[in-house]
């Protein structure tokens, strides 16, 4: 039993749209509250200027999460605001500040806020590092990241790759812990109900590609894999449907052209919009398999969702993806090539589905929120 500690979490949260980090931060705050640690989230009034945001809207249309104290106050591009917010948190004297780091663009803002907090000589600053070296790199990344890291006391990562990247910048205390399961998207629904909600064929094998669509996530590789299946195994292709669920974060035309040129329109169902929290369960429960054909990755928020909803996975052997999906047990691991992905798609439907589900239910016991909070409190 830990002594009661006051906690501030700095990072995305409501009214910013759900998505990995907002959902994670809100669930983490709830866990600390369940363990009797007073917790407040400080989130962004402006996270990205519109010209830097590739989606349609940064803000949620859903109801505010119940029972959470969320201060909407950080402006990522206003240095006067950074000092004001840093001094406000400094005066609160929280025992622990937990700050998310995922993009060097945020380093000046977050690094300045942390320097202000540090002056109270009381608060321990712990960073949950989603990325240290971003997927798409720029020349400013290293100096910005160094600026952010300096006031941080300790780090938590959710993949070995991020931990190794961190070691290129600092030898401060750091530990790796598994990404806990998202269990705040509601209970599972029946496959029939889920497929009806989405409006898809209930007789076909359903593969789900879920999340924001960006180059590193390899959707183009998946589309080439579906073309290979059509050419080599037309009977299997006719039983297949691929649901693309998520908002484009780059040029949509690149993908729609691929679908048309590969003549696979009849197998692709596009739900290319932002998927709200209340809709998530329907997509995962409708799917027979969740696929992550990523070119590169650190960790993924899709894997914990698949575990939560007991959905088998196909992942590529990049970053931490493979280490979180035991091959042949809860899904398949393949190479990030169209040929390897096509083979994995054909193979997974030959495996015993009930055995995969049983293995998932056993494997997901490792992904605990209490383990995650314990790790933070022990740093």
Q: What name fits each language-model region?
A:
Residues 11-18, 30-87, 91, 162-163, ...:
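N-terminal strand-loop element at the rim of the active site
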Residues 150-189, 377:
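Donor nucleotide-sugar binding/catalytic pocket of nucleotide-sugar-dependent glycosyltransferases
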Residues 186-200, 232, 257:
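A short helix/loop element that forms part of the nucleotide-sugar donor recognition site in Leloir-type
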Residues 201-217, 223-226, 243:
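Conserved donor-binding/catalytic core segment of Leloir-type glycosyltransferases
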Residues 253-278:
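Nucleotide-activated donor-binding/catalytic signature segment of Leloir-type glycosyltransferases, i.e.
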Residues 282-298, 311:
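Acidic donor-binding loop of glycosyltransferase active sites
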Residues 306, 312-315:
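Short hydrophobic beta-strand element within catalytic cores of glycosyltransferases
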Residues 327-339, 345-352:
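Conserved acidic donor-binding segment of nucleotide-sugar-dependent glycosyltransferases
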């Amino acid at each position: 039993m830990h002594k009661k500690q006051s906690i501030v979490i700095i990072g995305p949260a409501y009214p910013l749209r759900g998505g990995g980090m907002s959902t994670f931060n809100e669930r983490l705050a709830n866990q600390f509250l369940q363990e009797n640690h007073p917790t407040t989230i400080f989130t962004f009034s402006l996270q990205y200027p519109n010209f830097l945001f590739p989606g349609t809207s940064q803000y949620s249309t859903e109801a505010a999460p119940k029972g959470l104290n969320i201060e909407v106050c950080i402006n990522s591009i206003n240095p006067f605001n950074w000092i004001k917010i840093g001094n406000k948190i400094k005066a609160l004297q929280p025992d622990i500040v937990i700050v998310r780091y995922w993009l060097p663009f945020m380093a000046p803002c977050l690094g300045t806020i942390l320097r202000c907090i540090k002056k109270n000589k009381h608060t321990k600053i712990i960073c949950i590092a989603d990325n240290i070296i971003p997927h798409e790199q720029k020349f400013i990344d290293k100096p910005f990241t160094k600026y952010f890291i300096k006031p941080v006391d300790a780090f938590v990562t959710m993949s070995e790759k991020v931990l190794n990247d961190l070691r290129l910048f600092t030898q401060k205390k750091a530990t790796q812990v598994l990404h806990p399961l998202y269990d705040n998207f509601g209970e599972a629904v029946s496959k029939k109900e889920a497929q009806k909600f989405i409006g898809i064929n209930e007789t076909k094998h359903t593969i789900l590609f879920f999340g924001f669509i960006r180059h590193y996530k390899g959707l183009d590789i998946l589309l080439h894999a579906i073309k290979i299946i059509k050419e080599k195994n037309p009977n299997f292709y006719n039983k297949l449907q691929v649901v693309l669920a998520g908002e484009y974060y780059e040029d949509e035309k690149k993908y729609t052209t691929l679908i048309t040129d590969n003549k696979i329109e009849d197998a692709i169902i596009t739900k290319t919009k932002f998927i709200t929290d209340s809709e998530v369960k329907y997509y995962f429960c409708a799917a027979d398999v969740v696929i992550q054909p990523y070119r590169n990755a650190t960790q993924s928020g899709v894997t914990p969702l698949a575990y939560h909803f007991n959905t088998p996975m196909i992942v590529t052997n990049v970053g931490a993806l493979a280490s979180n999906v035991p091959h042949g047990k809860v899904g398949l691991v393949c190479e990030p090539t169209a040929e390897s992905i096509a083979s994995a798609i054909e193979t997974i439907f030959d495996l015993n589905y009930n055995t995969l589900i049983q293995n998932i239910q056993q494997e997901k016991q490792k992904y605990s929120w209490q383990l995650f909070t314990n790790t933070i409190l022990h740093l």
